Amino acid sequence: MLNTLPDFHRSFAEQLKLKLQSDSRIHSLLAGGSFIHGGFDQYSDLDFVVVIDPLYYDEIMAQRMAFAGTLGHLLHAFTGEHVGEPRLLICLFGPQLLHVDLKFITLDMLTQRVEEPAVLFTRDNDALKRQLAKFSAHWPNMTPEWFESRAWIWLHYAVVKLGRGELFEALGMLSFFREQVLGPMLFRRANLPQRGVRRIEALGIDPDGLLTSTLATHDRHSVGIAIRRAADAYVNLRADALPDNIADDAARRAVLAMLDAYSHKG
């Protein structure tokens, strides 16, 4: 299973597996991310789920940084509260740089998940299989209504930042809009799981250049054009699966009218 990885990643994963197999507190080691989705290459991160014996869970959680430090030359690490997952430790190992995610759970916590993990080792295969069988993996694709209820609010934010002259803020929102709205909708159009803007270039799922049309420089006119093209791209993609909450499309008209007014300002 690990022999499909690039040499550097494989070496780290094999050492991690041996290290955890020798630690009786560890029940199982699972892998996810690109290991599951495919396309693993030299630029990929390693994503692991470390399943801990409940008797030692609090102990290991309290010492996660030190625990990670035993796995290699740990340069820096921080926990995943910013993505709503405090059990996650995001690590950078060196001297050859490698990003490794370690999620610490007990077997009972292995419930809701977005993917079926690869099992690198387990001390109780039957117990692990029973737990995995209780819940099916569910990829968190967003609904048409989810996009519609947010799209015009976020585009309005970009417009008012343009109006104030906060071009960096507007540029940041355009990037956010591509990642949260346009990218996922392009994946939807291609009948693929929604994954932000991940590997869109390699997948070739934006043949019309909808995303690149929304790129702008730090210039008021350029940002104004990019916001309008972002709105146009959204309407284009929205047509694939019309949401129930369009109503009379008043939000779209109001946002574009404000954009017209601010685009001619200054």
Spans of model-derived segments:
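Short gly/ser/thr-rich secondary-structure transition/capping motifs
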Residues: 31-33
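Conserved nucleotidyltransferase catalytic core and NTase-mimicking acidic/glycine-rich helix/loop elements
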Residues: 136-266
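A short, charged helix-loop
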Residues: 116-146
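Metal-dependent nucleotidyltransferase catalytic core
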Residues: 1-24, 35-37, 50-102
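Hydrophobic C-terminal alpha-helix "anchor/cap" residues
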Residues: 19-21, 29, 177
